[in-house]
Amino acid sequence: MTPEHLPTEQYEAQLAEKVVRLQSMMAPFSDLVPEVFRSPVSHYRMRAEFRIWHDGDDLYHIIFDQQTKSRIRVDSFPAASELINQLMTAMIAGVRNNPVLRHKLFQIDYLTTLSNQAVVSLLYHKKLDDEWRQQAEALRDALRAQNLNVHLIGRATKTKIELDQDYIDERLPVAGKEMIYRQVENSFTQPNAAMNIQMLEWALDVTKGSKGDLLELYCGNGNFSLALARNFDRVLATEIAKPSVAAAQYNIAANHIDNVQIIRMAAEEFTQAMNGVREFNRLQGIDLKSYQCETIFVDPPRSGLDSETEKMVQAYPRILYISCNPETLCKNLETLSQTHKVERLALFDQFPYTHHMECGVLLTAK
């Protein structure tokens, strides 16, 4: 695979290999055949980051070869959304001959939505001043004149300049309902929007007919919490990153959802609160004991669940686990399978043509 060519003719073969690999990894815990969810074969990534290489009067996007670490010039990137590809061309054209904007520019980050909005961040090894702002505003206006719905941000050490805003609002059709999700620059968002829709719809399907409340750890901008709210009486969700919590609160209001409560705390802290080990001021006014959480949802980082959280989630009759790293999922299942069995298993091809797999399991108490 090269940056400017995707082996689309190999898509089905690479997906089949992932199915076999996941089944093999899951064999100690389940003999289920995974439900398989396919990605678009190109233009599936809604965000991308590129270093900028200065070559005399020219400059261009580059990425680094993972094996050799050599730099590769990238003028188009078919894995990224069509809007990112349009912006890559337009940004280089707008910056190349502008001394203020190109000087000490070392990276450009792109974040886009299916609703055709974009935030583009320009990263510099220099101080940004009023002259930079004026030139950046002129570039933004020129991009908008090309019908590109874009917001620009300048970043340097201890500096962030937003020309308008640092977020965009995604609109996703999820099981017959449009969901609005505010996505903040430099915060985690699901990279493959088409796959995200399928993940949300699968999670809705496996939690149909649920009783009681839902607890979610690591909720981000509320991506899963808000979509799943319709299947539960109430949802209690935790998140540590301030921008994500703020986005989640906005998304609750934008989607007119009244049964979701977001708490800003780490999963480890929440475990302590639930077990009565510590009291937290952030939980004042929230009666944890009033929640009847029959289901817990976890979408942990690549490192998986820590041992204390493993023990905590085992107390719930149903565990819905989305994993971006099946190796740590299987490590967690060594513990979780002592008390729970795998009822549903799904493979989400979040990153085609790579070894990465995203998967989902529903576990029920034995």
Swiss-Prot record:
It is an enzyme of class 2 (transferase). It comes from the Bacteria. The keyword Protease does not apply. Transmembrane segments: none annotated. It catalyses: uridine(54) in tRNA + S-adenosyl-L-methionine = 5-methyluridine(54) in tRNA + S-adenosyl-L-homocysteine + H(+); uridine(341) in tmRNA + S-adenosyl-L-methionine = 5-methyluridine(341) in tmRNA + S-adenosyl-L-homocysteine + H(+). S-adenosyl-L-methionine binds at residues 190, 218, 223, 239, 299. InterPro entries: MeTrfase_TrmA_AS, MeTrfase_TrmA_CS, SAM-dependent_MTases_sf, TrmA_MeTrfase, U5_MeTrfase_fam. The keyword S-adenosyl-L-methionine applies. One of its GO terms (molecular function) is rRNA binding. One of its GO terms (biological process) is tRNA methylation. The active site is at residues 324, 358. Keywords: Methyltransferase, S-adenosyl-L-methionine, Transferase, tRNA processing. Its EC number is 2.1.1.-, 2.1.1.35. One of its GO terms (cellular component) is cytosol. Dual-specificity methyltransferase that catalyzes the formation of 5-methyluridine at position 54 (m5U54) in all tRNAs, and that of position 341 (m5U341) in tmRNA (transfer-mRNA). Belongs to the class I-like SAM-binding methyltransferase superfamily. RNA M5U methyltransferase family. TrmA subfamily. This is tRNA/tmRNA (uracil-C(5))-methyltransferase. It comes from Escherichia coli O127:H6 (strain E2348/69 / EPEC).
